Design a protein with these regions (language model features):
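N-terminal secretory signal peptides and thylakoid transit peptides that target proteins
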Residues: 2-21
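Rieske [2Fe-2S] iron-sulfur-binding domain
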Residues: 90-194
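C-terminal segment of N-terminal export signals and the immediately downstream linker at the start
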Residues: 7, 16, 26-66, 70
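Pocket-edge structural micro-motifs
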Residues: 54, 67, 75-76, 121, ...
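Active-site-proximal structural scaffolding
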Residues: 23-26, 171
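Generic detector of short, well-ordered, non-transmembrane alpha-helical segments enriched
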Residues: 9-10, 65, 120, 146
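Extracytoplasmic/periplasmic/luminal assembly and interaction segments
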Residues: 60-108
Length: 194
C-alpha cells in the first residue's frame, strides 16, 4: 500500500474556514443575548434627565413629572408660604434636614435651590404611599398650616416637605438631584453638573 502525499495547504484552509464559521456562529449566538441584556432606548431615556419648562407655572400650582418611574413634584410657593416655614420648626421632626436624604444644596430651610420652587419625590417615606398636595391652611384640620398629607397613615409634611413630629413617616420627603437653566428645571442632574 502506497501512501499518497497529503496536501497540507488544503487541510490548513479547511481548518481556517471551520474556525471562521465557528466564530461567526458564536457571534450569532452572543449578539441576541447581549442585545437582550442591554437596556432599551425607552429604559435609557427614562433614567436620563428630564427637562421641565416652569415659565408659565402659577404661584400655588403643583406639577407632577415622572422621573425614573417615580413621581416628582414641583410646587411654586408664594412669598407667604416661604415666610411661614421658619415658624414651623418647633413642630417638625427634622427641621434643618440633618438626616441625609437630599443633595447638599437642598439642606436649607426651603429645601430647594430657589426658594419659590420646591422639587420633591412624591413618595411618602413611611410605606411609599403618594401624599396629596394640600396647600391651604386649615384644609386637613384647624391646625393644618398647608403642605402634603398622606392619607394612608396620616403623615403630614410642610410646604418644604419636612415631616411633622409624631408622624409615621420617619424622614422628610426626598429631594431628587436637579438644577435650573433660567426657568427650565432639569431633574436628574445636580447643580454640580453645570
Amino acid at each position: 500500500m502506497t501512501s499518497m502525499p497529503v496536501d497540507v495547504t488544503k487541510r490548513k484552509w479547511v481548518v481556517a474556514i471551520t474556525k471562521l464559521l465557528g466564530l461567526l456562529g458564536l457571534a450569532g449566538l452572543l449578539y441576541p443575548l447581549l442585545k437582550y441584556l442591554s437596556p432599551s432606548k425607552e429604559a435609557r431615556a427614562q433614567g436620563g434627565p428630564v427637562r421641565v419648562d416652569l415659565s408659565t407655572m402659577k404661584i400655588g400650582e403643583q406639577k407632577t413629572i415622572v422621573w425614573r418611574g417615580k413621581p416628582v413634584w414641583v410646587v411654586r410657593r408664594s412669598k407667604e408660604d416661604i415666610a411661614r416655614l421658619p415658624s414651623l420648626n418647633g413642630y417638625l421632626r427634622d427641621p434643618l434636614s440633618t438626616i441625609d436624604q437630599q443633595p447638599s444644596y437642598a439642606k436649607n430651610i426651603n429645601r430647594s435651590v430657589r426658594p419659590d420652587f420646591l422639587v420633591l419625590l412624591g413618595v411618602c417615606t413611611h410605606l411609599g404611599c403618594a401624599p396629596t398636595y394640600r396647600p391651604e391652611p386649615g384644609a386637613v384640620d384647624a391646625a393644618w398650616p398647608g403642605g402634603f398629607y398622606c392619607s394612608c397613615h396620616g403623615s403630614r409634611f410642610d410646604l418644604a416637605g419636612r415631616v411633622f413630629k409624631d408622624m409615621p413617616a420617619p424622614t422628610n420627603l426626598e429631594v431628587p438631584p436637579y438644577r435650573f437653566e433660567q426657568d427650565v428645571l432639569i431633574i436628574g442632574e445636580d447643580v454640580a453638573a453645570m
